Amino acid sequence: MKIAIYGRPVNNNQLSLTESLIKHLTDTGCSIRIHSPYKKFLTDNLKKEFNTGSFDSYEDIKSGTDFLFSIGGDGTLLDTVFLVKDSNIPVVGINAGRLGFLSSISKENLEIALSSLAKGHYSLDARTLLRLEANHPIFEGENIALNEFTLHKKETSSMITIHTYLNGEDRKSVV
């Protein structure tokens, strides 16, 4: 299997979990690539080099990746939207925190989950990928989200117009 690993390079609590994951995947013959900032974080904090590849963007993993592992919480998993976009790469959420709704594999169940994954005993939850377009350049990067967007008006007395489309079909316009 070809695995990509993503995590936020800020949480020392997940170092041993990530190290165990990499060891398990390597021992089972998986090809691994780690998101570059996270790989640097791991190397700096564990004082250890990892014999894995790295990646920086969607372009690096969009083809030839079987799964992307997200290590952290739900926020970390939501970050992966910008990495997988419309590639249909399944995201496996490993919860390194206290509570996870999207990242549902706990540290305690990691080995069981990895074994099931290797045997093909898993199911996929379909998620909705949304794209937001605006008349003004309001995005610094990607204009996509998983499941929902939150809109805030800059001026409370101004009106906004929202056009909603589903698969290119006008659903309803709201003023």
Model segments located where?
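ATP/NTP phosphate-donor binding region
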Residues: 1-67, 108-123, 134-143
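Short glycine/serine/threonine-rich phosphate/pyrophosphate-binding segments
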Residues: 14-15, 75-81, 173
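Short, conserved loop/helix-junction motifs that constitute active-site signature segments
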Residues: 26, 84-87
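Generic beta-sheet signal
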Residues: 35, 71, 92-94
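N-terminal glycine-rich "phosphate-gripper" loop used for MgATP/nucleotide binding
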Residues: 66, 70-74, 81-83
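Short, acidic/small-residue loops that bind anionic groups at enzyme active sites
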Residues: 87-105
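Catalytic core of DAGKc-family lipid kinases
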Residues: 101-173
